């Protein structure tokens, strides 16, 4: 099964929450140490976020994977830093995670 970029038009980006961009979520450690507000941990050359998937022979999405974004830190680091939680968990990580779970449960 080839790995393919999932387009923003896919239902996974709007089944519950309307997601209009593939958000870059830095690790909490990088974000705390970043003085210039960047979210790309390895510089400008890695600033493009990819959300990719694998589809079955009928075109159903089976696997979701992310690249150049640490979406899971937004799910697991909510009590460590209130600003990080508000900026990344509430606005970026949770909406995508909820959409992925709801999509998986309904398809």
What residue spans do the PLM features occupy?
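Extended, composition-driven regions rather than compact fold-specific motifs
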Residues: 1-107
């Amino acid at each position: 099964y080839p790995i393919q970029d999932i387009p923003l038009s896919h239902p996974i980006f709007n089944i519950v929450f309307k997601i209009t961009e593939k958000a870059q979520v830095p690790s909490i450690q990088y974000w705390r140490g970043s003085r210039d507000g960047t979210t790309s941990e390895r510089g400008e050359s890695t600033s493009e976020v990819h959300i990719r998937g694998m589809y079955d022979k009928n075109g159903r999405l089976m696997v979701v994977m992310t690249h150049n974004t640490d979406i899971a830190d937004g799910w697991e680091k909510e009590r460590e830093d209130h600003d990080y939680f508000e900026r990344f968990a509430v606005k970026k990580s949770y909406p995508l995670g909820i959409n992925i779970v709801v999509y998986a449960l309904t398809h």
